Regions:
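Short, acidic/turn-prone active-site loops that include or flank metal/cofactor-
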Residues: 16-17, 41-43, 67-68, 138-140, ...
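General beta-strand structural signal in soluble alpha/beta enzymes
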Residues: 38-39, 63-64, 107-109, 134-137, ...
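Class I S-adenosyl-L-methionine
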Residues: 2-19, 24-130, 214, 219-221, ...
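Structural alpha-beta junctions
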Residues: 58-60, 130-131, 200-207
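A contiguous loop/helix-start segment that scaffolds small-molecule binding in enzyme catalytic cores
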Residues: 9, 175-245
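Class I SAM-dependent methyltransferase SAM-binding "motif I" and its flanking Rossmann-like core
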Residues: 101, 111-177, 227, 240-244
Length: 245
């Protein structure tokens, strides 16, 4: 098939949650898309779909990509890995069918598509077969530190982005070796994160933000947060810029 007869794959960053933080380029891509694909868990259209809802054309085809599992199985369990691997292969096939038919497919991704985004799993499998574009989005971490009014780094400060899912030993080691940190994937890992921050002397300057930039957002010093599970959309920030003009 002629390459020019094929459709175009576009990864669209939808930003951290506030629809007003969508970029002009993202809005334009949504206005042009024949198909809009969005990842979600069972029983939900997903947050990315909610962010862009006002910009979807009535005639566009919606393609939900529904995760078979989320947090009910440990991510290191073989059953989880197998189910997710099969899911991404099936998702690639569904998207490729539309691309082969000559359609423009916009795949939504909260924050930025290439930063902890599920879109990446499609990108690496399809970018060598179809014309592809990635539209960057405002990341969740920048949305959260802007909302909190928290200067995060300056000068030679080192910023580490850490998943809360890593082991407590590794999390503590990396926190000890950085000036500033963003801890993502908080959820049920909050008690472990708190212990690691306390062990490294950083708990007092840690800020907890949930649902950053969204309508029902909340932020507070992490030391004041109850030690229960945090929502999926939550982040812990540790500023490196402390006590400096």
């Amino acid at each position: 098939m002629n390459m020019h007869a094929k459709g175009r794959l576009v990864g669209v960053g939808t930003g951290p949650g506030d629809p007003e933080l969508l970029t002009l380029k993202a809005v334009r891509a949504l206005a042009e898309a024949d198909v809009v694909a969005h990842f979600s868990k069972r029983g939900s259209n997903g947050n990315a779909r909610a962010i862009v809802g006002a910009h979807l054309r009535p005639v566009c085809i919606e393609l939900p990509l529904v995760y078979p599992v989320t947090t009910e199985i440990d991510k290191d369990h073989n059953d989880y890995r197998s189910a997710i691997a099969d899911f991404y292969e099936e998702s690639v096939h569904k998207v490729a069918e539309h691309l082969e038919a000559g359609r423009m497919v916009a795949v939504l991704s909260e924050g930025d598509p290439l930063f902890y985004g599920s879109y990446m799993h499609l990108h690496v499998r399809l970018a060598d077969r179809f014309p592809t574009e990635v539209i960057p989005g405002v990341t969740a971490m920048s949305g959260c530190w802007s909302q909190a009014g928290l200067p995060i780094v300056q000068g030679d400060d080192v910023l580490s982005v850490l998943p809360g899912t890593m082991s407590e030993f590794e999390l503590t080691r990396r926190l000890a070796d950085t000036d500033a940190a963003v801890i993502m994937k908080v959820g049920r890992n909050l008690p472990k994160i708190r212990r690691a921050l306390e062990a490294t002397g950083k708990l007092a300057r840690a800020v907890y933000v949930e649902r950053g930039t969204m309508a029902n957002t909340a932020s507070m010093p992490l030391a004041d947060k109850a030690d229960d599970d945090a929502p999926y959309f939550s982040i812990v920030l540790v500023a490196g810029w402390v006590g400096r003009p």
